[in-house]
């Protein structure tokens, strides 16, 4: 999951960073490297707000070959996809817990970006939502 980044030279120096798909994620840096590091932090922070507010997270636009991008860690990408599938299903966390035979507390952890969730747990929840989580190496 790669989100395209727009780097714009700032009038005072350095670079301003924005995301077409996640407009809340704005930051800046003195160098391109600093701006890109700050962009990753801003993107993950924006994701936290989507999770807290139970809102669908926009998926990334297609990349052009010259685009700068932030690659989302797989642990986060899987939870983003799971959150979107869960919200589209319109069921409760309690119902998801019932479907996979786990306590609701474990479901709450699935939707916490700061909890190190086993990928098998995300896969099980996705399956309970009628989705398939797959991993591809290219």
Swiss-Prot record:
Record-level Gene Ontology MF annotations: DNA binding; identical protein binding
Null allele phenotype: Disruption suppresses an rpoE disruption; in a wild-type background disruption down-regulates extracytoplasmic stress responses and outer membrane vesicle production.
A biological process term (GO) from this entry: regulation of growth
PTM statement from Swiss-Prot or TrEMBL: May be degraded by Lon protease.
Cited SUPFAM superfamilies: lambda repressor-like DNA-binding domains (SSF47413), TTHA1013/TTHA0281-like (SSF143100)
DNA-binding region: 93-112
InterPro entries, per database record: Cro/C1-type_HTH (IPR001387), HicB-like (IPR031807), Lambda_DNA-bd_dom_sf (IPR010982), TA_system_antitoxin (IPR051404), TTHA1013/TTHA0281-like (IPR035069)
Annotated GO CC locations: toxin-antitoxin complex
SMART domains in UniProt: HTH_XRE
Stretches assigned to coiled coil: none
Induction (UniProt): Induced by amino acid starvation, carbon starvation and when translation is blocked. Induction no longer occurs in the absence of Lon protease suggesting, by homology to other toxin-antitoxin systems, that Lon may degrade the HicB antitoxin. A member of the hicA-hicB operon.
Family annotation (PROSITE patterns): HTH_CROC1 (PS50943)
Keyword DNA-binding: yes
Alphabetically ordered keywords of this record: DNA-binding, Repressor, Stress response, Toxin-antitoxin system, Transcription, Transcription regulation
Residue ranges constituting the HTH cro/C1-type domain according to the UniProt record: 82-136
Family assignment from sequence similarity: Belongs to the HicB antitoxin family.
Subunit structure: Probably forms a complex with the mRNA interferase HicA; when the 2 dissociate the mRNA interferase becomes active.
PANTHER family attached to this UniProt entry: ANTITOXIN HICB
Function: Antitoxin component of a type II toxin-antitoxin (TA) system. Functions as an mRNA interferase antitoxin; overexpression prevents HicA-mediated cessation of cell growth and inhibition of cell proliferation.
Protein name: Antitoxin HicB
Species of the source: Escherichia coli (strain K12)
Taxonomic lineage of the native organism: Bacteria, Pseudomonadati, Pseudomonadota, Gammaproteobacteria, Enterobacterales
């Amino acid at each position: 999951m790669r989100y395209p980044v727009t780097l714009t030279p700032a009038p005072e120096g350095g670079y301003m960073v924005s995301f077409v798909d996640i407009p809340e994620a704005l930051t800046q840096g003195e160098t391109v490297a600093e701006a890109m590091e700050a962009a990753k932090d801003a993107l993950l922070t924006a994701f936290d707000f989507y999770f807290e507010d139970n809102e669908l997270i926009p998926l990334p636009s297609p990349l052009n070959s010259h685009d700068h991008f932030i690659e989302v860690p797989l642990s986060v990408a899987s939870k983003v996809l799971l959150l979107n599938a869960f919200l589209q299903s319109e069921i409760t966390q309690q119902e998801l817990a019932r479907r996979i035979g786990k306590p609701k507390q474990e479901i709450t952890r699935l939707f916490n970006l700061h909890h190190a969730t086993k990928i098998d747990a995300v896969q099980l929840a996705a399956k309970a939502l009628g989705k398939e989580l797959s991993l591809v190496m290219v």
